[in-house]
Each structure stands twice: as C-alpha cells, then as structure tokens.
C-alpha cells in the first residue's frame, strides 16, 4: 500500500514541529504509560509510543475483521465448554510445557469438583496482519487470539483524537474526518457490567487482578472509570493479596477483604514468571469460586497456540460450530498455515519444511505477552535442537505473514522522531457473556492498530517494540 503521507515524511523540520504538537496532544488525551524507572508510581508518567500519522488499512479488510469477530467469540466459547476437545488437543503439550500443564491441572480440579460459576465473560482480541498475495493484493490473516488480559482497549480509545489533531494542524480536515471513532474501553466495560448484573448481587464488586509493577495502568483505569460511571466499583489486588485475604463461603462465593466479588478480571496471570506457588494457589481459589472470571481457566486454555493450530485442521470448526457453515467459512478465510510439531510423521514433515525454507515460517511456544516467537536462524537452531526431542510438542509452526511495508514516523519518549519502513497488526476486541448455556451478549467493541519497524520480527507495545496507531481506511 502506498503511503498517503509520503511528501510530509520528507520534511524533517515540519516533522519535528508536528511531533511536538502530537506528543502534547497525546499527553492531554491521556495516552499514557508509567515510566520503566518508576513502574509502581504515577508521579512521573510519559506518553505511550505512537505513530505520527495514521497508517493506511484497506477498508475491506477492516470490515472483514469486524465481521468475523462474533464468530471468533462463539468459537472461543465453544472450545472452552468442550472439555474432551481441550484434553485431546493439549495432551501432548501438557507433557512438555509446565505452564500449560499447571493451568490444565486447575481446569481438571474445577471440573472434578463441579464448576461453581454460572456467568461466563469473554473479553478477547483477535490479531491480524495483511498478507501480501501473489497478485499484490493484501489478505487478512490471523496471528493469534488473546483470551486473557487483552490490553490497550483503553489507550486505543484515546488515540483517534491525536491523529485527527495532527491532520487538522496540516489543514487536512477531510482526512481527519476519515479516522474512525473507537472506544473499546466502553465496550469491554459493558461486558463486565453485564456479567456483574447477571451475578445478581448489587453490593458485589469487580476484582481486577493486577501486577505489582504495572506501567500500563491508565489503559486499565479507562475500563475502571467506565464501570464506576455505572456505579460498579472495582478493587485492584495482586495474586499475593488474594492468597492472604481471599476466601470462599459454603456456596463458594468469593470474598476479598470481607467484600463479595461478582467478577474477576485478570490483567495478570498469562506468563509463567507471574506465578509463584502462592499465586497458583490464589488462582485455584479464584477458579473454584462462583464469581464470573474473565477469563475462566478453560477460556485461557482455549487461547493457546496449540488450540489455534488444531482449529485449523479440516472438520474441527464444523465439529465445534455445527450447523453454522457461514461462520465456519468466515473463520477459515482468516487462517494462516498452522502446523503441529507433535512427535510423529506429521511433525517430522513440518520440521523438514521449516528447515528447508526458514524464511516462510515462525516457531511459536505456548506463551502470551509478546516477544516469544523465533524466526530465521534462531528458529533453525531451535528446530535442530528440538527435532529429536519430545519437547517439540510444546511449540507450533506457523506460516510467516509477509505484509507490504510502508513508511511512517514513530514517536517514542527519549528518542528522536524517525521515519522508518513499518508493518502493522490489527486487533479487534470482542465481548461475549453467557449465563449457564444461554449467550446473552456477543459483539465486537472496537479495534487496536499497532505498528512497528520492519527490523523487529516480534513483540508488541508492552514488549517495547510496537507503537500505537490508527487505521486510515482506504
């Protein structure tokens, strides 16, 4: 895709002035992060990195991503309710991956005891890149679906005003008008509010499981503020707090500091290093409770890379979404090539193909949080080490998506504005709420565009690689 801002990107003096204005507007709008030096304090904050200009995104692909989001919501919900599918799919992974195994153990314990929760809440984000086809046209291909702690809905609600401001300064009012309104934080809060309401206890609270050091607190506060506007109170606690002050009554209702909890919203708990033994015990306590968890443990497992790979097998979508051929077709159209590395002929073939053409593949472990994937020579070395080991079952191979690079100017605290070749990743936020077996809400609630320099193979905004952006539909 050719850039709309080509000539503007060549004028260094104008770029520097625009960058100053854009940064001030970002700060005024609340596009904020705590600093890496003081991640526990809001005394000193900075702007979250962002692009100076919105990046061009084909309208048809944006519409396609929105159109398929409710199908992905249904699919994740269906997977989370299918214990046999999860067990079969993850059977080889849990033998080799301790983290997935610990999550799965909690899942099994809860199933054995009987699931106490009756209201289920999904806040997810499906991420895509635009694959360059043979004829040069871009195609929407899913990278992953995030089913736990899907972030940046709050900050993405505040960036459109920044890019409108930049274009207005340039007297491009018509172009400024094309930047889509976007308010994921409101939509995500609506889902939490619906789950809270269905829980049926007006004095109960929402519990946000937070990290001790949280730079991205303003993203979370945006959702908290939306809930408070509906008179729903949120308390922030760590896993350590829960192990000290959390308890269940005889009906398995959850209490923290003596206050009943209706909804547990996890913004922690998606990486192995976030769990001590004490934290695992706290997670089990939360999982056993009657409160609506976002996500419950089965939904977190539904978001693993291994599940993503198995869903791409012929017949899997039809089995999970019976009688919904249109939804199946929409979902399948977004799938990139995904390959099992389980021990056996199929896995051997996938490894051989990746070693023969490493530039065509990405090696993915069962990890969230960005910056975990292996490419190129790193991938080749890892595959050579793994190919004769059962440990390879804890990874999947994925076709490498090759988007068309474009120029934009990236703004980061402490760094000069720089024009670089970039690629973007589009995320669509989805919300669903289920009571027992009845789906009471299923919607898409906004988008997130993140852009990074092409020299960075992997990593998101939180990992310090990508920056916030907005789609400019073309």
From Swiss-Prot:
GO terms for biological process: amino acid metabolic process; nervous system development; response to cadmium ion; response to oxidative stress. Mg(2+) binds at residues 144, 146, 368. Substrate binds at residues 125, 148-151, 214-216, 220, 267-270, 450, 461-462. Changing residue 330 to C: In CNSHA6; uncertain significance. It catalyses: gamma-L-glutamyl-L-cysteine + glycine + ATP = glutathione + ADP + phosphate + H(+); gamma-L-glutamyl-(2S)-2-aminobutanoate + glycine + ATP = ophthalmate + ADP + phosphate + H(+). The keyword Lipoprotein does not apply. The lineage of its organism: Eukaryota, Metazoa, Chordata, Craniata, Vertebrata. This is Glutathione synthetase. Homodimer. InterPro entries: Glutathione_synthase, Glutathione_synthase_a-hlx, Glutathione_synthase_C_euk, Glutathione_synthase_N_euk, GSH-S_sub-bd_sf, GSH_synth_subst-bd, PreATP-grasp_dom_sf. Belongs to the eukaryotic GSH synthase family. The modification Phosphoserine is found at residue 415. Binds 1 Mg(2+) ion per subunit. GO terms for cellular component: cytosol; extracellular exosome. It comes from the Eukaryota. The gene is GSS. Its cofactor is Mg(2+). The keyword NAD does not apply. ATP binds at residues 144, 305, 364-373, 375, 398-401, 425, 452, 458. The modification N-acetylalanine is found at residue 2. It is linked to Glutathione synthetase deficiency: An autosomal recessive disorder characterized by massive urinary excretion of 5-oxoproline, metabolic acidosis, hemolytic anemia, and central nervous system damage. Anemia, congenital, non-spherocytic hemolytic, 6: A mild form of glutathione synthetase deficiency, resulting in hemolytic anemia. Affected individuals do not have neurologic abnormalities. CNSHA6 inheritance is autosomal recessive.
């Amino acid at each position: 895709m050719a850039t709309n801002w080509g000539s503007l990107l060549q004028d260094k003096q104008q770029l520097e002035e625009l960058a100053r204005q854009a940064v001030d507007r970002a700060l005024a709008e609340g596009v904020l992060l705590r600093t890496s030096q003081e991640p526990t304090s809001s005394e000193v904050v900075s702007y979250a990195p962002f692009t100076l200009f919105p990046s061009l995104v084909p309208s048809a692909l944006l519409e396609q991503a929105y159109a398929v989001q409710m199908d992905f919501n249904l699919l994740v919900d269906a997977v989370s309710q299918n214990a046999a599918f999860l067990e079969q799919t993850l059977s080889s992974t849990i033998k080799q991956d301790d983290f997935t195994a610990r999550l799965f153990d909690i899942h099994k314990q809860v199933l054995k005891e009987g699931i106490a929760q009756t209201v289920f809440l999904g806040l997810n984000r499906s991420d895509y890149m635009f694959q360059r086809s043979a004829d040069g046209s871009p195609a929407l291909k899913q990278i992953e679906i995030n089913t736990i702690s899907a972030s940046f809905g709050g900050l993405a609600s505040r960036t459109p005003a920044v890019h409108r401001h930049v274009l207005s300064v340039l007297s491009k009012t018509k172009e400024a008008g094309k930047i889509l309104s976007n308010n994921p934080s409101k939509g995500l809060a609506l889902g939490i509010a619906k789950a809270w309401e269905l829980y049926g206890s007006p004095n109960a609270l929402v519990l946000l499981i937070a990290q001790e050091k949280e730079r991205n607190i303003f993203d979370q506060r945006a959702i908290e503020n939306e809930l408070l506007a509906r008179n729903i109170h949120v308390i922030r606690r760590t896993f350590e707090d829960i192990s000290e002050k959390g308890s269940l009554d005889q009906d398995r209702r959850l209490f923290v500091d003596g206050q009943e909890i209706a909804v547990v919203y996890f913004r922690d708990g998606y990486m192995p290093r976030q769990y001590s033994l004490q934290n695992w015990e706290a997670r089990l306590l939360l999982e056993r409770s009657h409160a609506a968890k976002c996500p419950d443990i089965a939904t977190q497992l539904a978001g693993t890379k291994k599940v993503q790979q198995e869903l791409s097998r012929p017949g899997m979508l039809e089995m999970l979404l019976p009688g919904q051929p249109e939804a199946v077709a929409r979902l399948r159209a977004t799938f990139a090539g995904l390959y099992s590395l389980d021990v056996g002929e199929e896995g051997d073939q996938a490894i051989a193909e990746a070693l023969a053409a490493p530039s065509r593949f990405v090696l993915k472990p069962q990890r969230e949080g960005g910056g975990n994937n292996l490419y190129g020579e790193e991938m080749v070395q890892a595959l050579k080490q793994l190919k004769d080991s059962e440990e390879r079952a804890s990874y999947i191979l994925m076709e490498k998506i090759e988007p068309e690079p474009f120029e934009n100017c990236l703004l980061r605290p402490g760094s000069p504005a720089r024009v670089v070749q970039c690629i973007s990743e589009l995320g669509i936020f989805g919300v669903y709420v289920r009571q027992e077996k009845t789906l009471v809400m299923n919607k898409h609630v906004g988008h997130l565009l993140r852009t990074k320099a092409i020299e960075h193979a992997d990593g998101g905004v939180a990992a310090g690689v990508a920056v916030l952006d907005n789609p400019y539909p073309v």
